[in-house]
Amino acid sequence: MIPVVALVGRPNVGKSTLFNRLTRSRDALVADFPGLTRDRKYGQAKVGEHDFIVIDTGGIDGSEEGVETKMAEQSLAAIREADVVLFMVDGRAGLTPSDEAIAAHLRKIEKATMLVVNKVDGIDADAASADFWQLGVDEMYQIAAAHGRGVTALIERALDPFFDNLLSTNSEGEIEDLTNMEDEEAEQQEYSEEDAEESLKRLQDQPIKLAIIGRPNVGKSTLTNRILGEERVVVYDMPGTTRDSIYIPMERDGREYVLIDTAGVRRRGKVHETVEKFSVVKTLKAVEDANVVLLVIDARENISDQDLSLLGFALNAGRSIVLAVNKWDGLDNEVKENVKKELDRRLGFVDFARIHFISALHGTGVGHLFESVQEAYRSATTRVGTSVLTRIMKMATEDHQPPMVRGRRVKLKYAHAGGYNPPIVVIHGNQVRELPDSYKRYLMNYFRKSLDIMGTPIRIQFQNSDNPFENRVNKMTLSQERARKRMMSAVKNRKK
């Protein structure tokens, strides 16, 4: 499961700065759900090839009389969702009573906690950090979040227990120069045909993992129980924590599935509960672990920013997507038309996803959901050979030639599969990374249409082909060497 890191500390110690630095390589998901404080942010981040979730637990002021109340509610819940807590303090401001109060509270929680002294750029880091040893910590890490110094070493150390061979040689907490970090993160991962075959084999050996996600009270619980009820599968009533989804194996039409239930543990008698506990972390973990994401939207409410945020997260994760517009029954035709127009207007960026209008309560349209789930999964995992992809690429370039870059025509040579779920097409050629975004979108849409891909995003990766003669030095023949000597001798005689 993807690990979760919580940033804790009093205001203005640099939590948001570190949050933005960690999540900048991918769109940060900012959650503003009912029941959550507005200043708590959840985002997806990456270290090396490993993903993790980071939470900015804003709103903790650490006041001596109010720390128990402040931390006991939303912020404490976020800390409990985390695998690792980064307790941030301000190296320039020094130790404060607020820091001591927060540290005392964190000691009561059995959670891996690391002390992070921020803002140590331009000052004596060791001298600025000395007072913080009073907090009784075993290890202290010094960083400058605004400039990225020490951040990679910190995160590698924090996540080392969750990933093998993560630590670099420079991970002892010292200040390191990361001025080129953005360029390193911008580099694309290179995919080979062997990687694609391995990922496809793993997918073929497993059941389809289907995550049902959505805002609170859109009908996820009702839909889950409707699906399970139709299949006569016992609803598991297992104890779970606030951050763990329930994995329910089921079978439909001879196909094995694992339903990832994010709506929480419920008994059959509680299907119509109006209050639902919502965990952002639980939802993000479910998306990361799923093959197909079923996003439930309430037809009686406008599409919200939270709907778009969840959809964007699933899209960034490369998951297949099916949309279910729930509570469709009872709406008059005029309202239905307005809802459809709103869907077309706001969800154009996922025009590849099937949309179903359903009633989870009465079962209307629920059975057809699995047709789209299977279609999306099939599109995401169907093997496509190099010859087919190369032929499609050549057809695309014949219909619309690549543009000129610095006076030279970009040349696309061949294409092969680089991965599945989502499908990744790797195109090799000259200057291919210089292609404008408009032409990249053209190629992506051309491949999608040609391969009849539906329900899943498709990714195109470009790799510049190596020049086999780049470092080659031609050896002169004997006659060429003699001619060269005669020419050099003539030049010398002319100078005399």
Curated annotation (Swiss-Prot):
Top-level lineage group: Bacteria
Residue ranges constituting the EngA-type G domain according to the UniProt record: 3-166, 208-381
Domain KH-like: 382-466
Gene Ontology BP, a term: ribosome biogenesis
Binding site for GTP 2: 214-221, 261-265, 326-329
Keyword Repeat set for record: yes
Positions annotated to bind GTP 1: 9-16, 56-60, 118-121
GO molecular function terms listed in the Swiss-Prot or TrEMBL record: ATP hydrolysis activity; GTP binding; ribosome binding
Keyword line: GTP-binding, Nucleotide-binding, Repeat, Ribosome biogenesis
UniProt entry tagged with the keyword Nucleotide-binding: yes
Family of this protein: Belongs to the TRAFAC class TrmE-Era-EngA-EngB-Septin-like GTPase superfamily. EngA (Der) GTPase family.
Protein's job: GTPase that plays an essential role in the late steps of ribosome biogenesis.
Subunit structure: Associates with the 50S ribosomal subunit.
UniProt-recorded name of the protein: GTPase Der
Natural source organism: Vibrio vulnificus (strain YJ016)
Gene encoding the protein: der
